[in-house]
UniProtKB/Swiss-Prot annotation:
SUPFAM superfamilies: Alpha-L RNA-binding motif. The gene is RPS4. Residues 133-193 form the S4 RNA-binding domain. This is Small ribosomal subunit protein uS4m. NCBIfam families: PRK05327.1 (NF003717). Gene3D superfamilies: Ribosomal Protein S4 Delta 41, Chain A, domain 1, RNA-binding S4 domain. It comes from Reclinomonas americana. It is found in: Mitochondrion. It comes from the Eukaryota. Keywords: Mitochondrion, Ribonucleoprotein, Ribosomal protein, RNA-binding, rRNA-binding. One of its GO terms (cellular component) is mitochondrion. Belongs to the universal ribosomal protein uS4 family. One of its GO terms (biological process) is ribosomal small subunit biogenesis. Pfam families: Ribosomal_S4, S4.
Amino acid sequence: MTKRLSSKQKVYTQTGINIWGKGPFLWKNNTKDKWKNTPGEHKKKHKLLERYSPMIRGDSINEMNQLGYLIPKSKNEVKISYYEPRYASQLKEKQKLRKFYANVTEKQFYNYYVKAKSFKGKIGDNLIKMLERRLDIIIYRAGFVNSIYQARLLVNHKHVLVNNKIQNISSYLVQNGDMISIKPEIVNLLRNQYNWDILQKSNGSFLKYLPYLEVDYKTMSCIYLYTPEMNEIYFPFQLDMNKVIRYYV
């Protein structure tokens, strides 16, 4: 397992977004969104990388376009990166996606990108679908744990079964029809995270519905039915996959 010494707060301040949707819980007794500030001693507000501004096309615009500061949007409108060139914008978008999946290493993330190119369809869609097949992500999406890091911990400590066999590799890619379950002796520990009486009666119906997972919260198990489509995958932030792909091109 890769060492991750930096805190979760640092990931929030680096990206400037509520990346896992749990930002308010990381800063106690605080009413402000501290992740909107840059890391370091001299904190500043994260600035928007791009603004829209109507401009007339000319030689100066063509020159700015060549330098990577402009992206054509329409006949009379261009997107201007006031604060950072195009590369920095692409890098930050890639980092957002990589850090969301519990800081997947750069080498591993690039390998996913290479595999995604070999499949039919859009590279960005293939990349996300492959990441969503990871065992730790399936456990997190099913609602058995509170975070992806907790899901990864369960897998690494051999508390997760795939088709009734122990699987301790968090990056294991689940196949259609696979059954993922938690060891019975660990189920009671996970039950303490929820109001279990309500969860048993509703069988988890108050959690986010995922059509590609058949979940049984009474036994803490689920069946991976099929690879989800992009409209079935939820992110707590806006994501521009075109920038992620252009970063590697």
